[in-house]
């Protein structure tokens, strides 16, 4: 068996817990890199993306995506797109990332925008 990094172990642990709690709700999946942050709502049953937002979107592209303010903006835009798609309840998938900094800012902004998790 291949040796898993701490990040990969954490990701597996989070995904396993999500499967138990999902109950048919879409998954709000978050990924961050050194420069950008990405978020999408995924319907795992159908295998489709319902809504997505990132710091690479055209209206935000000129700004840096490596700040908590940018992450909060992505969270607000994702919540608006989710409302437009008719989604209010989701399961938050932080992947292997700690719930801190940009991930927390995105989650808080999505909650303020009307998503429940």
Curated annotation (Swiss-Prot):
The keyword Magnesium does not apply. Keywords: Ribonucleoprotein, Ribosomal protein, RNA-binding, rRNA-binding. GO terms for cellular component: cytosolic large ribosomal subunit. GO terms for biological process: translation. This is Large ribosomal subunit protein uL18. SUPFAM superfamilies: Translational machinery components (SSF53137). HAMAP family: Ribosomal_uL18_B (MF_01337_B). Part of the 50S ribosomal subunit; part of the 5S rRNA/L5/L18/L25 subcomplex. Contacts the 5S and 23S rRNAs. PANTHER family: 39S RIBOSOMAL PROTEIN L18, MITOCHONDRIAL, LARGE RIBOSOMAL SUBUNIT PROTEIN UL18M. It comes from the Bacteria.
């Amino acid at each position: 068996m291949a040796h898993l990094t701490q990040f990969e172990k954490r990701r597996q642990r989070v995904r396993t817990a999500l499967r138990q709690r999902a109950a048919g709700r879409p998954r709000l999946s978050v990924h961050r890199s050194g420069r950008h942050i990405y978020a999408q709502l995924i319907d795992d049953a159908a295998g489709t993306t319902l809504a997505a937002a990132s710091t690479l979107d055209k209206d935000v592209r000129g700004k840096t995506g490596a700040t908590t303010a940018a992450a909060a903006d992505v969270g607000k835009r994702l919540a608006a797109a989710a409302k437009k798609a008719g989604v209010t309840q989701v399961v938050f998938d932080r992947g292997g990332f700690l719930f801190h900094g940009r991930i927390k800012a995105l989650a808080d902004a999505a909650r303020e925008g009307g998503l429940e998790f």
